[in-house]
Amino acid sequence: MRKIRTKICGITTPEDALYAAHAGADALGLVFYPQSPRAIDIIKAQKIAAALPPFVSVVALFINESAQNIRRILAEVPIHIIQFHGDEDDAFCRQFDRPYIKAIRVQTASDIRNAATRFPNAQALLFDAYHPSEYGGTGHRFDWTLLAEYSGKPWVLAGGLTPENVGEAVRITGAEAVDVSGGVEASKGKKDPAKVAAFIATANRLSR
């Protein structure tokens, strides 16, 4: 049986975290990028992590952050996986004694083709839409057909996903994991419980 894994990113409150977990999210993303409207600090992250039931993965998202600051956060917040969304290379990403996911901003098929070679130590790759000045959370999607024949390293689909289009996205790409942020929000940084539930329910229906 194939299960479509779901990650709800940009969690900012324990309430949103708990709702997403109870709705069936496999992972929750905490954004440690000050420029993001979904950014949180260590104290908020600790409260969110403490509210979660067992077996829900906590993912820390960093964008071009210093190694020193990443280590400080990892020492104080129970993080299971790191997601790097900036210009980091494999040598930087692998130094923190945590599994890591590397976001790839997709413009062409070669971005997808070359990703596994560029990041051989990544647990998985996350394919997101390219934006010239932003590193994610834009609500934009890329050409999903570019992934239809991809069979390399485990990967996650992101970029412009919503409860309404996640089914189509999975059917086109064959994704086994999906990541959403803005597509399930009432406003930036505040999740909409109904959208979260609908997104996860749709992903679960596609599992087989």
Curated annotation (Swiss-Prot):
What reaction gets catalysed by this protein? N-(5-phospho-beta-D-ribosyl)anthranilate = 1-(2-carboxyphenylamino)-1-deoxy-D-ribulose 5-phosphate
InterPro entries xrefs = Aldolase_TIM, PRAI_dom, RibuloseP-bd_barrel, TrpF_fam
Q: Which Pfam families match?
A: PRAI
Q: Which pathway does it serve?
A: Amino-acid biosynthesis; L-tryptophan biosynthesis; L-tryptophan from chorismate: step 3/5
Arranged from A to Z, the UniProt key words for this protein are: Amino-acid biosynthesis, Aromatic amino acid biosynthesis, Isomerase, Tryptophan biosynthesis
**A Gene Ontology biological process annotation?**
L-tryptophan biosynthetic process
Q: What class of enzyme is it?
A: isomerase
The EC number on file is 5.3.1.24
Gene Ontology MF annotations:
phosphoribosylanthranilate isomerase activity
Q: Which NCBIfam families match?
A: PRK01222.1-4
Under the heading HAMAP family, the entry gives: PRAI
Family statement drawn from the similarity comment of this UniProt entry: Belongs to the TrpF family.
Recorded protein name is N-(5'-phosphoribosyl)anthranilate isomerase
